[in-house]
């Protein structure tokens, strides 16, 4: 199966490896990039991989991009399997719509997609989720396998914990309810899905 991973190369100058804990998963390995842990968790023998890396052009992202390539190489993922999507340093709607278009165009027609929304400006998660919604509608057989956020808790500059959360349930909830044209039915389905999520087995 072709699996496509989406991440944003961070702007910060200093990246520290973290052990991102996940629910019902094996022990993590240290990484600077939550998407690398996602790849470790989801990649299976025989899978084909490509990674879409959103990055702004500056010295910090260039250094962090090289570090990402090094971590991917340790998983057997070569640089030619990574496709960069360049982002100008502005937040104008036309810029973000252009990035959304580029993401949709870069996604294969048949693939399972895993996206990480940890890094980047506050607009990046909106762009990424919009691109996934559009691609699911326009592509032949595209499935969203997960949408991840890596949270790091600190106190007095010390790391207390690092957690990796899959937000795909929210993405799917919006898709299911958003496609319904009868508001009463949509409201009932929305409340039923929330109720089911609150009572799901851990």
Regions found by a protein language model. Give the residues of each.
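Detector for conserved single-position "signature" residues within domains
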Residues: 115
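Short Gly/Thr/Asp-enriched flexible loops that form oxyanion-binding sites at enzyme active sites
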Residues: 122-136
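Long, low-complexity, Lys/Arg-enriched
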Residues: 1-112, 133-202
